[in-house]
Amino acid sequence: MTNKITERITGHTELIGLIATPIRHSLSPTMHNEAFAKLGLDYVYLAFEVGDKELKDVVQGFRAMNLRGWNVSMPNKTNIHKYLDKLSPAAELVGAVNTVVNDDGVLTGHITDGTGYMRALKEAGHDIIGKKMTICGAGGAATAICIQAALDGVKEISIFNRKDDFYANAEKTVEKINSKTDCKAQLFDIEDHEQLRKEIAESVIFTNATGVGMKPFEGETLLPSADMLRPELIVSDVVYKPTKTRLLEIAEEQGCQTLNGLGMMLWQGAKAFEIWTHKEMPVDYIKEILF
């Protein structure tokens, strides 16, 4: 077994990709290529800078080149379904896709963000089942987290977002959760700071599921005041680069338990790996490399 890329790639090697922007910070190529090499699988994983304008053409190109599959990240998660053939039940419910698999020319979209997030919490020893959470965000990752949390048994979810293009998506998420699960979901404007303070005070966990904290918003946070946090609160961030966002720095200063996005990235990636290869990712080995 060798990790030398020149010795691994042959005329039979299949390509798996990642499409997003920004993309150069991603640890997914390292994670998946190390896992492929460890298991002796003839795949290679590459990252491609792709936004809204290029998305349709890129999917058509990937289809024509018969890629085995690819991951999807911001800002493409909620738009790519238009160019696929099928969606998994979870992706249909969430309305977002972060993993595509090509089975004999049929492109199927999956979503693994929600299960990845909940698994990361469990691995870190945090139990939020039957309790209340407050989350910022209304994009693909935030939606997947909210719906999976509701399906898993979280009692109440308070969602905060700016009144932008994603706000309507959050309204749909609230409707789905309230109609299809036993969880109570509510939506608020992120500018309503007093409401945010109230919801955080009633929650066991506060989560940032937006891109605020990573480039080009590194050093920023949606939290208007540090005194909204308390020592017994869990504060999590889906951002993993930097590994300690401004939000997590503030949370640590307030004595909170914190969790960055590395665990979620690992476990959502492990599920995607299984979808493409029908093999389990060597998670313990990958943890040694990434953590």
Curated annotation (Swiss-Prot):
SUPFAM superfamilies cross-referenced by the UniProt entry: Aminoacid dehydrogenase-like, N-terminal domain, NAD(P)-binding Rossmann-fold domains
InterPro entries linked to this entry: Aminoacid_DH-like_N_sf (IPR046346), NAD(P)-bd_dom_sf (IPR036291), SDH_C (IPR041121), Shikimate_DH (IPR011342), Shikimate_DH-bd_N (IPR013708), Shikimate_DH_fam (IPR022893)
Binding of NADP(+), residues: 137-141, 214, 238, 261
Pfam families: SDH_C, Shikimate_dh_N
Gene Ontology MF annotations: NADP binding; shikimate 3-dehydrogenase (NADP+) activity
Top EC class of this enzyme: oxidoreductase
Keyword NADP: yes
GO BP terms: amino acid biosynthetic process; aromatic amino acid family biosynthetic process; chorismate biosynthetic process; shikimate metabolic process
Keyword annotations of the record: Amino-acid biosynthesis, Aromatic amino acid biosynthesis, NADP, Oxidoreductase
Annotated pathway: Metabolic intermediate biosynthesis; chorismate biosynthesis; chorismate from D-erythrose 4-phosphate and phosphoenolpyruvate: step 4/7
Binding site for shikimate: 26-28, 73, 98, 113, 240
Source species, domain of life: Bacteria
EC number: 1.1.1.25
Binding site for NAD(+): 161-164
Record-linked HAMAP family: Shikimate_DH_AroE (MF_00222)
Family: Belongs to the shikimate dehydrogenase family.
Subunit note: Homodimer or homotetramer.
Function as written in the Swiss-Prot or TrEMBL entry: Involved in the biosynthesis of the chorismate, which leads to the biosynthesis of aromatic amino acids. Catalyzes the reversible NADPH linked reduction of 3-dehydroshikimate (DHSA) to yield shikimate (SA).
UniProt-listed NCBIfam families: aroE, PRK00258.2-1, PRK00258.3-3
Identification of the protein by name: Shikimate dehydrogenase (NADP(+))
Source species: Listeria monocytogenes serovar 1/2a (strain ATCC BAA-679 / EGD-e)
Gene behind this protein: aroE
